[in-house]
Amino acid sequence: MENFTEQKRPLGLYDPQFEHDACGIGAVVDIKGRKSHQTVSDALSIVERLEHRAGKDAEGKTGDGVGIMLQISHRFFTKVADELNISLGNEREYGVGMFFFPQNEHLRAQAMKLFELVTRKEGLEFLAWRAVPVDPDAVGQKARDCMPSIWQCFIKKPAKVSKGIDFDRKLYIVRRVFEQASNGTYVPSLSSRTIVYKGMFLVHDLRLFYLDLQDEDYESAIGMVHSRFSTNTNPSWMRAHPNRFILHNGEINTIKGNTDAMLAREETISSPIMKEDMNKILPIINTSGSDSAMLDNALEFMVMNGMDLPLAVMITIPEPWENNKNISQKKRDFYQYYATMLEPWDGPAAILFSDGDVVGAVLDRNGLRPSRYYITKDGRMILSSEVGVLPCEPQNILVKDRLRPGKMLLVDTLKGEVVDDEKLKEYYASREPYGEWIDRNLVQLKDLKIPNVKTPSYTGDDLLRLQKVFGYKYEDISTLILPMARQGAEPSGAMGTDTPLAVLSGQHPPLFNYFKQRFAQVTNPPIDAIREKVVTSTSVYVGAHGNLLEDKPENCKVLKVHNPILTSTDLLRIKYMNVPGFKVSTVSINYYKNTSLEKAIDRVFLEVDRAYKEGANIIILSDRDIDEYHVAIPSLLAVSAVSQYLIRTKKSTALALILESAEPHEVHHFAALLGYGACAVNPYLAHETIGQLIDDGLLDKDYYAAVDDYNKAVLGGIVKIASKMGISTIQSYQSSQIFEAVGISKDVIDKYFTGTVSRVGGIGLEDIQADVEALHNAAFDPLGLDINMQLEDGGAHKFRSGKEEHLFNPQTIHLFQKACFTGDYDTFKQFTHTVDNMGRNGVHLRSLLDFNYAPDGGIPLDEVEPVSSIVKRFKAAAMSYGALSSEAHETTLHLVCRLLLE
């Protein structure tokens, strides 16, 4: 392999963005900072006992990835320096880099020369290269085939630069400049404090492969280890952990939104420490990395710009504070201040972190990953994803505990102490008067005045016409909107769907229907957002983000909204808010009929740009004022297109998007709109429809109470959808794009839904426009003929003759029941034949596929392995404990027994 930084390209159903893993983690720390080889050996012993959390190939010789982070051993590297005939100076007066170079000697020499040039250009003294002693025979053939050329470098600290973070900052700049100029070299670590040894090993291979780790002179007070289990990923040398600051077990499910926001901050962020060097280190995130690597990029950026590592972790993965009545007001103000600038990186995760001085661990707010630790009387902290990784005499154990959700465990080896979570957070919460800053700058929606302005209302034919334009069906109102307004909760329905995919439907489905909600693949059962309400947050922040790298009062000048589903009164408050620091601009997403949709979207971009240049920091995208000549861009397309445009132009953290639209009325619609960039949504037509239900006597309720209950139902549904991805905050869910598109062309996805998973092609902009204008023509007949001013019953929820096709209809249900009751196989074949014929018209993707039988009959059956042999290789276990219900487990067990399997 000649490129250790190249991202794998999507191929078939594979996409590198799916790469997550479930891993084993561990650490051993001498609390007093006493360095020894025993700590190194114990850390290696921990990872060797995590074999059950480490993946390997079918031959059992190549692993998914194992690694260790240690302090730089002055004793060991002084000995190495003597062999290289160089002088390193005192401890921490030199930096050590680990490099994965291309195997090709010419490419390696070029990369080395480039790095030396960059180092000297940045004012540092390059000392020497060292080929890292390794034993290739200790690893499997697959790992050897793609093994990089592994080297270390040594760099002298300038006299004018202080030890520690100041010197590491210079090394960080050198590495970032080199990474952007080089192609194919990966740098696992470059620091004066820490070093990373890792690769594609089995857990026992790490100690054997790197001879440095066997040397008794290699001493450290810190050892952090990681074993990788690539549940749905490809192993590689580069993706093995640790990263440069963290190692990680779990998944960051909001990663798309997190990284987009972090990259957008590059346009407005400024650093009093980096100053003119800032441009050298951008972009902040390497988007070809794994979710944990991108989190590491973000933390490294904050630390190198002057933020303490524990603080950076604390605000990136905050504890659940908003609904927790047991935390102090000072801590609440602290979290509130940073929440206005940085959305949580959410998902089930256990994270260990270190900068060479402190070692810490934190769990996600739900505690969905295991982590237990011992503190011993002889001054050591031992932590791992499970107990028993190191033998400990019971009489030597001082503390035995587990890491709590949202809590931080920290060991400071410089001070020689374990820092209590409460004490640590109170320290950071007391550094600035965050409470005063919030009181003066944070604006609450409920505190804004209601302007003396009347919003347009719709009744009778005007309301009906709008409902037809935006694709409302009678059953949408009767089975969705009415129950939600009445009960304040989503109505219950049967699981599964037997109607055609949107792209195969002939009923002009809304664009929302082309997007399918994704769910966490490496997570325990979904979060119970009802019983675990304390960990959830529905608040969003509207306005420009402050400067994360510089604490100041005006950073938190944003509008806080507790429910992103807005009433028309809420929207009026925002539209006419007269608060210094806020400017609101409304941009129409309507276009003149017969104009191309692409030109209509480009016009919206121009208007958004104009508003930004005029000082706006809140944009309201509105489809009000539809008439016979004007058509609305589908709201999801408008929101996502503008959001992607702002991300590309790095304005997404400077402008907040609010949608005022008649189109959304189902929970899925709102989830998609928030997921693709809207901060808040005002579904004015859904609210007007509730008023109609009250006027018609179908809903016996006060209008405002009914609207509040409808909004509450929508919000509850969004929280439930986010919970499937292990996400607990709407702020994190916003812009996370956790959907898969089915039936949309690659051109549309790449331009307007960038980064969305889409494994089959489909409709283009012309098709989307044709669907929208067909609905518009049904309400405003261009020929001037009479139109049917009644809402259709689309037949999506219940079978209706001549409407949406259902695989389970009166005919197929009758045949299926008859076959079951009589046991008649011919009737069953009649049932399957009927379903197959219906499917050929296109219902699911599988309906479009068939077996390609060989003309000659194929391989004779007597040459094929018998079924009784094949089934012995079936696996029937669940992926994780609790992932199957009792009923599903028992049914699977019966099946296994019937197949004569153990």
Spans of model-derived segments:
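Glycine-rich phosphate-binding active-site loops on the catalytic face of alpha/beta enzymes
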Residues: 674-695, 752-753
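Positively charged, low-complexity/disordered segments
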Residues: 890-902
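Alpha-helix-loop-beta-strand connector modules within alpha/beta enzyme cores
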Residues: 633-659, 710-714
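Short beta-alpha connecting loops at secondary-structure transitions
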Residues: 276-285, 390-396, 654-659, 688-708, ...
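Catalytic cores of alpha/beta
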Residues: 659, 663-677
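Flexible, glycine-rich loop/tail regions that form catalytic "lids" or insertion modules at the edges
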Residues: 63, 76, 285, 302-349, ...
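Conserved short alpha-helical segments that host acidic/polar catalytic motifs at enzyme active sites
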Residues: 2-547, 552-554, 577
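Conserved, mostly hydrophobic/aromatic
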Residues: 409, 623, 673, 729, ...
